[in-house]
Amino acid sequence: MKSTLMTASLLILVLLSIVDYASVYAELIDSEISMERQWINACFNICMKISSDQKYCKSFCG
């Protein structure tokens, strides 16, 4: 009984650490995507001020 309880507790701790790691990793990916969007928007805005060619700026900035 005691070993079953310890095994269950250990399993719960492992599962909680996996869920915690997954949520931190998801936040990291989300922040990277957000930073990439900010970079693309800034690039596009600067390009439009310089060239005013929307097609060129879209292809240049991604």
Swiss-Prot record:
It is found in: Secreted. Its main location: secreted. It comes from the Eukaryota. Expressed by the venom gland. One of its GO terms (cellular component) is extracellular region. Residues 1-26 form the signal peptide. Residues 27-36 form a propeptide. Disulfide bonds join C43-C61, C47-C57. Keywords: Disulfide bond, Ion channel impairing toxin, Neurotoxin, Potassium channel impairing toxin, Secreted, Signal, Toxin, Voltage-gated potassium channel impairing toxin. One of its GO terms (molecular function) is toxin activity. Potassium channel inhibitor (Kv). Belongs to the short scorpion toxin superfamily. Potassium channel inhibitor kappa-KTx family. Kappa-KTx 3 subfamily. Has the structural arrangement of two alpha-helices stabilized by disulfide bonds (CSalpha/alpha 2(S-S)). This is Potassium channel toxin kappa-KTx 3.3. It comes from Heterometrus petersii (Asian forest scorpion).
